[in-house]
Amino acid sequence: MPESSLFITFAFSRELAIIMQYFTSSLPNGLRVLFIPSTSPVVYCGYQIAVGSRNEAQGEEGLAHFCEHVTFKGTQKRRSWNIINCLESVGGDLNAFTNKEDTVYYAAVLKEHMPRAIDLLADIVFHSTYPQREIDKEVEVICDEIESYNDSPSELIYDEFENMIFRGHPLGHNILGTAHNVRSFTTADAQRFTSQFYRPQNAVFFIHGNVKFERVLRLLEKATSDLPTTAAPVCTPLTPLNNQTEKRIVDRHTHQAHVITGCKGYAAGSKQRMALYIINNMLGGTGMNARLNVSLRERRGLVYTVESSMVSYGDTGLWCTYLGCDNHDVQRCLRLVRRELNLLMERPLTERQLLAAKKQIKGQIGIARDNRESLTLDMGKSFLHEGQPRDVDDLLCRVDRVTADDILTVAREVFNPEAMSTLIYE
């Protein structure tokens, strides 16, 4: 039995008092395991694999997402129907998603069905056969998914904007790929791609529930004992990110204009990231009291939706604002957005403003961590990429360390007008 490590974190602040316990271990084949105990009868578990659309070679855009879909279509011992029915027949749930750096397969079941979930997940992740007859059907499902995005300008504009920012870089292309690419993929393509990246040393297994960790490890060893111990191949070094900005207007014949303006942000491990996280929440976070919402919607009635967002990757990031408005209000809205950015660049936050921003962030973190599925996925992701689960204690400490000077410095660096790109759908 592999050795395991116990971690207990205590997170205290004026708003929150949280105790979190988790265990980690590694199997002989290199699979890392994260266990978060709870008192709930529901178990969340799955695999987080370090492969996404940024790992695709030129000409195979969409292959990572394609593999995620067809992984459910048959293994050496299960047909597609058996995979679907295995957990759903006992009220469980089986799901998956792909992003630019990860592919995740996960399940939710009552704890008495945990062995069934562990066996099924290992089977589909590591032993899928990708039968061509099933691929031929699933291809059309994926193409319909692609078309649904093309029919939604408020979603499509994010993909096109990211392609502008990361032009010529694997992070720039759409996760779904194109219908042309998807229709060209075969069983051999899926087998080649997954054999490269779906390996124990390139993944973590996470589980959250009222179960015995020793039993989890025994079940995992049994389910993965036949897997190779070789590491996933090192990706070809990526081309340097371009630093060009762009202003682009696209005629989409939409009823309203869709507008995104933004720039590169910070990588996941950047010390400046938390300051930008606080700034982003102040500007266009989920609260109705966000500065952009107050300025553009509450005071002037120019928009229904205005928001800002940020995403961090291993080596870079992205920050942007999005809004939808009447075509004749586009330039006015952009000026108002710019005014809010300038205020953050020119005026340091007062102590009261900074404390209020931190209080809001801490409350949001506490509520988000009450969602056990979200908590488990987030801790699994940080365990995969950072080598240690990112817990509440760490997040709260990072929030507390941010100063008004940090906010001012980051705002001046990120919101430089010369670094901004803009994309408009009319």
State each model region's role.
Residues 65, 69, 169, 258:
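Histidine-centered active-site/metal-ligand motif
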Residues 30, 37-87, 161, 271-283, ...:
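Active/ligand-binding-proximal structured segments within catalytic/core domains
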Residues 21, 26, 83-232, 238, ...:
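Charge-rich, well-structured scaffold segments of protease-associated domains
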Residues 37-41, 46-48, 231-289:
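His/Glu-based metal-binding/catalytic segments typifying zinc-dependent metallopeptidases
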Residues 17-32, 37:
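Non-catalytic terminal extensions that flank enzyme cores
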